[in-house]
């Protein structure tokens, strides 16, 4: 198993400004902290125009400004070619099977699997055919997807 367990580096660049505007209701707890309780039916999914079929739900934070937590839904068979992200991110596969290619090696991650990428680690991201994929993504800075122009990944 590859030590650099791959993070789902999903693709959502410019469409984030509209997604980030979704406000989430926070409820103060008796001890002064914050609780966010969001039933699945209340989650607002937004299309990501740059990547047809991809949807994103901002749960906390603002992807255009800094650290944030999102859900990302990829259609079955989706592929994001070789790319990297500037910020570190940590993710869990909630449904579907994600397929990452890192350093020329392909790794399949079924539901319940974890992956992370530190800034600028190149990879290819796929959602296996047959079932849409959903990941929970914790990003430690602004979100971007930087294509690796002219570089082909080893398959």
What do these predicted ranges mean?
Residues 1-7:
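Positively charged n-region of N-terminal signal peptides that target proteins for export
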Residues 75-78, 85-103:
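Glycine- and acidic-residue-biased ligand/ion/polar-headgroup-sensing regions
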Residues 80-82, 100-101, 117, 122-129:
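Short beta-strand His + acidic residue motifs that chelate non-heme Fe in jelly-roll/DSBH
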Residues 33-36, 45, 124-155:
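Double-stranded beta-helix
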Residues 62, 103-120:
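Short acidic-glycine-tyrosine-enriched beta hairpin
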Residues 68-85, 118-120:
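Conserved short histidine dyad/triad with adjacent acidic residue
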Residues 7-17:
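Bacterial N-terminal signal peptides
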Residues 23-66, 150-155:
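A short, N-terminal "cap"/entry segment at the start of jelly-roll beta-barrel domains
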């Amino acid at each position: 198993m590859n030590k650099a367990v791959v993070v789902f580096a999903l693709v959502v660049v410019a469409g984030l400004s509209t997604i980030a505007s979704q406000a989430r209701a926070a409820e103060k707890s008796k001890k002064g902290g914050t609780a966010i309780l969001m039933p699945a039916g209340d989650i607002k999914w937004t299309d990501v125009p740059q990547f047809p079929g991809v949807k994103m739900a901002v749960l906390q934070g603002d992807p255009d400004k800094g650290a944030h937590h999102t859900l990302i839904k990829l259609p079955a068979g989706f592929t994001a070619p070789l790319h990297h992200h500037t910020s570190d991110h940590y993710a869990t596969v909630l449904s579907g099977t994600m397929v990452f290619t890192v350093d020329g090696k392909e790794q399949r991650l079924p539901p319940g699997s974890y992956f992370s990428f530190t800034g600028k680690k190149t990879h290819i991201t796929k959602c296996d055919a047959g079932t849409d994929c959903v990941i929970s993504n914790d990003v430690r800075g602004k979100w971007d997807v930087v294509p690796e122009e002219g570089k082909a990944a080893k398959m």
